[in-house]
Design a protein with these regions (language model features):
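C-terminal transmembrane helix and the adjacent membrane-cytosol boundary/short C-terminal tail
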Residues: 5-7, 190-205, 272-299
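Interhelical loop and adjacent transmembrane-helix boundary motif
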Residues: 8-14, 57-59, 72-75, 79, ...
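Transmembrane alpha-helices
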Residues: 20, 123, 127, 179, ...
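Short membrane-interfacial helix/loop motifs at transmembrane-helix boundaries
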Residues: 30-79, 147, 250-251, 299
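Transmembrane alpha-helix signature in integral membrane proteins
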Residues: 78-112
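Membrane-interfacial helix termini and adjacent extracytoplasmic/periplasmic loops
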Residues: 55, 60, 137-178, 212, ...
């Protein structure tokens, strides 16, 4: 009898431990997304909350559904939102490519270093996370301004005669995003390259393969999972970035994060803003599905 109670308690405890993460995902991920989608099917009104209910009781004690897809139709018809989405995808894709081109050699070089130097370089990579994200962005504003460090050095060296307009440009946005998310590219690449079997490259060298050929045929294909993981970790947050385009790009930098903020807090059009957020979420799911498909093919 006691043994049966113990087995029952063990199963209950195991189910509780396993189910806790799923409960967390449901409460803090699926439920909020459900509320956002629900609001996107409503109409904006002046009131609190600033949207219409999705159903109401009629005089005949029946539920009347009041959903509408006008917000989604408006997104597809209005050019402003398409420009925001396309510009966000462009900025995120180019920033991800730059992070990959810069981060891969850095990650590869770190794996070739000795123990103490390797630890020191990894510390330098994660060191920016110890400071506030906003402080780092404000620091770049000071460096890129007309009288900032970069323009001052260029003027004193005689390379330019007039200060360059670096702040509030697309270049400043790319610099800020690459600087912020570069560690998210380097760390998964380093973890992948650190686990590679050096015997394979040594065997290729013994067979007469040149180093660059061994890299293209062995190291690069084996590091594909790290490349994909790093690209996802950079592309997904960069796509919805709001702070960097606003502070470094100014008002002319139109990205979907800024559009979403304006609809929520300035226009107070919560249904339209929820539709913008829902469509953005669908766009973010696409690279994740591609990565999952790749993992299934690999296994």
């Amino acid at each position: 009898m006691n043994e049966n109670k113990y087995i029952h308690f063990e199963r209950l405890w195991r189910g509780l431990v396993i189910g806790t993460p799923y409960l967390w995902l449901v409460l803090f991920f699926l439920v909020p997304i459900g509320f956002v989608f629900k609001i996107s099917l409503a109409d904006p009104i002046i009131g609190q909350p600033p949207f219409t209910p999705l159903w109401e009781w009629t005089d005949s004690a029946r539920i009347s559904i009041l959903t509408t897809f006008d917000n989604y139709r408006f997104l597809f018809m209005e050019e402003l939102y398409w420009i925001s989405y396309l510009n966000s995808v462009k900025v995120a894709a180019i920033s991800t490519l730059i992070c990959l081109l810069v981060g891969y050699p850095m990650a590869y070089g770190i794996t070739r270093c000795s123990g103490n130097i390797k630890s020191f370089l990894l510390l330098l990579i994660v060191l920016p996370f110890w400071t506030s994200f906003l402080l780092r962005v404000y620091a770049w504003m000071g460096m890129l301004s007309t009288h900032g460090v970069i323009n001052t050095l260029l003027l004193n060296s005689g390379l330019i005669e007039q200060p360059l307009k670096l702040l509030y440009t697309d270049l400043a946005v790319y610099v800020g995003i690459v600087y912020t998310y570069l560690p998210f590219m380097i760390l998964p690449l380093y973890a992948n390259l650190e686990r590679r079997d050096l015997v394979l490259t040594e065997a290729a060298a013994d067979l007469g393969s040149r180093p660059w050929r061994a890299f293209l045929d062995i190291t690069l294909p084996l590091s594909t999972p790290g490349i994909i993981a790093g690209c996802l970790l950079v592309f997904i947050p960069a796509l919805g970035e709001f702070v960097i385009p606003t502070l470094l790009g100014g008002l002319d930098s139109l990205m979907i994060g800024r559009t979403l903020f304006d609809e929520f807090f300035q226009n107070r059009d919560w249904p339209l803003a929820s539709a913008v957020a829902t469509l953005l979420l669908l766009i973010l799911i696409i690279p994740i599905m591609i990565f999952q498909k790749y993992r299934e093919q690999e296994t």
